[in-house]
A protein has these predicted regions:
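Adenine nucleotide phosphate-binding catalytic loops in nucleotide-utilizing enzymes
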Residues: 120-124, 157, 161-234
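Phosphate-binding loop of NTP-binding sites
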Residues: 9-144, 148-159, 217-220
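Conserved beta-strand termini and adjacent loop/short-helix elements that scaffold enzyme active sites
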Residues: 5, 56, 143-144, 166-169, ...
Length: 234
């Protein structure tokens, strides 16, 4: 049966938001200038080991992709991981209103989307639109190695969000201490709050340490990371 509507995109967006409102998932929205898709893939795989997880397919991160991803939410899903992209100011605001994230992640701020912006500050401002749409009492995961960390942190604290930081080199909630070779794999040693945690990772993940740190930061919002097995990422 065909339904005639005045605006297909608005109809798609409104219906997808109804699906989201009807669900009880913990929605996680990921944005940033780079690393969104690879983080989304790793995070969704890891969360799925904890509980049923819905996630954006491929790079479904625009005004069409996000609504389609929301339509894929199933009744048994506990988590939902959604990638959010942008080409212009206001786009992240629109998409995260649909997602209604329980937790947001901003990977980094760089010149990846400079064509419609004058400078990095304008990009950071556009990315920070997510902060306004994280649910009351929600959380945000931020990269402490990014030059806009304090800017994003301060905006988040004004909204009374819980800020979870991660870093490869600076003191943070989730911090890499060191990574060493262990036979054909690698031993990754992290400092999580005041505790040390070790993970065995495949060689292929050695180049995605930032994604591992961000993933652990997200998971720490929902469960005790110390309970994860050493081979959790294997």
């Amino acid at each position: 049966k065909k339904i005639k509507v005045n605006n297909t995109l608005n109809f798609l967006s409104n219906c997808s938001n109804l699906v989201r409102k009807a669900s009880k998932i913990k929605a996680i929205a990921i944005t940033g200038s780079s690393g969104k898709t690879s983080l989304k893939e790793l995070l969704s795989q890891c969360l799925n080991k904890i509980a049923s997880t819905s996630y954006s397919k491929k790079s479904f991160n625009n005004k069409f992709g996000v609504p389609i991803s929301l339509f894929n939410i199933q009744k048994n899903n506990i988590f939902g991981v959604f990638e959010v992209g942008m080409d212009k100011k206001g786009e992240i605001n629109h998409l995260t209103k649909l997602i209604m994230p329980d937790l947001g992640v901003i990977t980094n701020i760089s010149y990846a989307h400079i064509k419609n912006f004058k400078n990095l500050y304008e990009i950071a401002l556009a990315k920070s639109e997510m902060i306004n749409n994280i649910i009351s009492g929600g959380s945000i995961v931020l990269n402490k190695d990014d030059k806009f960390f304090n800017f994003l942190k301060n905006k988040s604290l004004k909204k009374k969000l819980k800020v979870i930081s991660f870093s490869e080199k600076n003191n943070a909630d989730i911090r890499m201490i060191k990574i060493t070779r262990k036979k054909s794999n690698y031993l990754l040693i992290l400092k999580i709050s005041n505790n040390v945690k070790k993970f065995i990772i495949k060689e292929s993940l050695k180049f995605y340490i930032v994604n591992i740190l961000a993933t652990i930061a997200v998971i720490s919002n929902y469960t005790d990371v110390q309970s994860l097995k050493e081979n959790f990422f294997y």
